[in-house]
Amino acid sequence: DVLALLIEHFSGMTTAEFLKDRIFDPLDMKDTGYNISKENKGRWMPVHNLDKQGNLINSKTQLPTEGNTIYGGTHGLFSSASDYMKFCQMLLNKGQFKGKHLLSPKTVDIMTMNQVGNLYEAAGQGFGLGFGVTTDLADSKALGSVGQYYWSGAYCTYFFIDPKEELIVILMSQLQPYNNYYGEKMRQMVYQSLITKY
C-alpha cells in the first residue's frame, strides 16, 4: 500500500488511473479495476465460506463492488481469468505483450529474483518485488522449477509462472478463510501431468 501512495505522489494520478493507463488499457484488461461496472456485475462471483458439513455457502461478508475510492496497492482489484492471463503472459514475455513493451526484460528479472536472502519464512522460497520465488526445489519440498514465481490472493486465488517450462497457471476462487490447499494441489497436478519434449 506504500507503493500505491508513491504512485499517486510521483505520477499525479490516483492508483486506479495509473494502473488503467499504464497496465490495464495496454494489456486490453477490460474486466479489471477497483469497481465493477453495472453491466459486469452479474459476472462477479460472490465470496463463499464452507459450512460445518463442507458445503459452499455465501459469505455474510461481501466486498463492495462499486463506489470504492481507496485504491490499495495490495488489495481491492477485481479481475477475470482472461484478464489475469494477459498480465501473466506479459510477465512471461519479459514485459512485452502483443508488440507493446510495458516493462524492460531487466525489470522483470529484478522483480522475479529473490530480494530477501534467507529471510523468507518458507524453506526453498524467497521473495521478489511482489512475488514469492522458488530458490531451491529440494528445500521447498514442492514440484516446480527454480525461478518459478507465484502469489495468492485473500480469497484463495493463486497463480504461478514457470519461465523454464514456459508455463502459466491461474486458479480463480472466492473462498474464505484463506487456505492454500487448492493452490498447492493444483500445482502438484500440473507438474505431474507435464510431458518432456524431445
Regions found by a protein language model. Name each.
Residues 159-160, 166-175:
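Short, well-ordered beta-strand elements
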Residues 53, 164-165:
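Residue-level recognition of short loop/turn positions
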